[in-house]
Every structure is written in structure tokens, then in C-alpha cells.
Amino acid sequence: MSVRILLVALLICLSHGSASCVGREVAVAVSESGDAFIVQATIRPPVSPRTAWEVLVDFDHMTGILSNLTASRVVSRNGNVLIVRQEGIARFGIFSYPFKAEREIRMEPQRRILAKNLSGTLKRMESEVRLIPSGVGGVRIEYRAEFAFDSIIAGLFGVSFLNHEVEEQFQSIVAEMKRREAQAASDPLQPNR
């Protein structure tokens, strides 16, 4: 590799901060496809697969994890299929986007979570979360979602808006995963909530 390429890479790293150059915990990409936005994210939390799973499916306590949620509860449970109702306000710059969602959640414990919007302020939303074993006792989370908005403003700023929201939400989720993992390590007899 030439010195010139190394210098350019170093300048990019310095201008974006060290997190861009050293294994980021949350990486998000958003693209447009017709009337929808496709979100893909890779999350590398430094926690066990079990802790990651417990946080991802803790819908009844999600308001304590995600600051943009004002309500989150499981309204129906049938084995590994849940109906979850959530409300909140997403903020992006000077804009805010109040939302409501009722979603069907299908879980394959410790492996996969499928979500589909049944009703709410989004025109359409479907997502898949996959937990993939990584390293010794670690986990990598792959997230893919498709969003279609009813709001013109949300649609206009969709790529930037979703990139901001998804990255912020997964950073909060990773912080909760770390908190619970540390709590479990310090006192294995206490529940992780």
C-alpha cells in the first residue's frame, strides 16, 4: 500500500473520529427503493448472545431503553408470536415525528426476530433481526428493515432521518446490553433489568 493511500486513510479516520476506524459497534446504511427506504445495520455489542436477545425482546421495558418511546407494551402473546403496541416521538433537527405502531413480532429464540407493522402512522414497515454467533461467546446482530412513510416531511428526509433514528436507537440498545451484562457479571443472582 502506498504512503499516499495510508495518509488519506489516516486523514479520514482522524476527521471522523476513532470510532469510524476501530470496529464500530453500530453501523447503519439507508437507501431509497421506490416509495420505501431500506435500512441495513450491523451491531457488534460486546455482550453474550443471551444478553443481546433479552434486551432486544424486552418490549415491556423498552421505554426505559429508547428515549423516543413514550409507551411500549405486549398486548397479546401466543407462544413466540407477540403483538406489541408502541408510541413515541422521533426527533430530527427541528422536526419531530409522533408515531404509533402495532406490530406482530415473530421470534425464533436466540436467532431471529421478524416484525411487521399491523397499524399505526407508518404506511408500511417490516424488519428482520438476526443474531449470529461471533468469536468466543460473542454476537453480531444484522438488522434489515423496509419503511414506507405516510408523512411527506418524513419521506423527504427519509434517508437522513432513518439513519439518525436507527443509529441512535441501536446505540441505546447496546448501552443497555452492556449495562445488563455488567450487572450480571457483578451479581449473577440478580435479574438483568
What are these model-derived regions, one by one?
Residues 117-164, 168:
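Beta-strand/loop substructures that line and gate deep hydrophobic ligand-binding cavities in soluble
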Residues 5-16:
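Bacterial N-terminal signal peptides
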